[in-house]
Amino acid sequence: MGASAVLMASGKELPHYVKGIIADCGFVSMKSQFQYMAASWFHLPHIPVLLWRLSVRCRIQAHFSMKDADTTHAMAVNHRPVLFFHGSRDGFVHPDQSVKNYQMCRAPKRLVIIGGARHLCCAFQQWEKYHQSLLRFFEKYDAGARIG
């Protein structure tokens, strides 16, 4: 949920020293993520009452609404550059989620799909491609960054 949280935060006012956003395997919304997991993991069809129950539980136990866990608005108003990573074999968050975030993003952006990588394994699967993508991003948007 880290990548999606960062993407959601990008729609808010952030400190001046935040030069860009890096999102590895982020989903668009908690609703879309739940629907994907219900279908792919448990072979359940779309059942609105399940979403409603989960939303109620989120409000009671975690004090937030599932509607709040959505990157759509942030991607429309964010002005900071975003580097999206996603593994082509991610079985937890479908790669289409990063593609949708990329398409909605109005800021400078780049999408890197790492072939064969599973969830959060992009750097492990193709380190050189991952590392070079990061270097190019930092060089372009944060020239003062020190990268070892």
Please give the residue ranges for each predicted region.
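Conserved alpha/beta-hydrolase "acid-adjacent" motif
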Residues: 91-97, 122
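Alpha/beta-hydrolase-fold serine-hydrolase catalytic core, especially in secreted/extracellular enzymes
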Residues: 139-148
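Catalytic histidine neighborhood in serine/cysteine hydrolases
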Residues: 102-120
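Short beta-strand/loop motif that positions the catalytic acidic residue
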Residues: 77-79, 84-86, 90
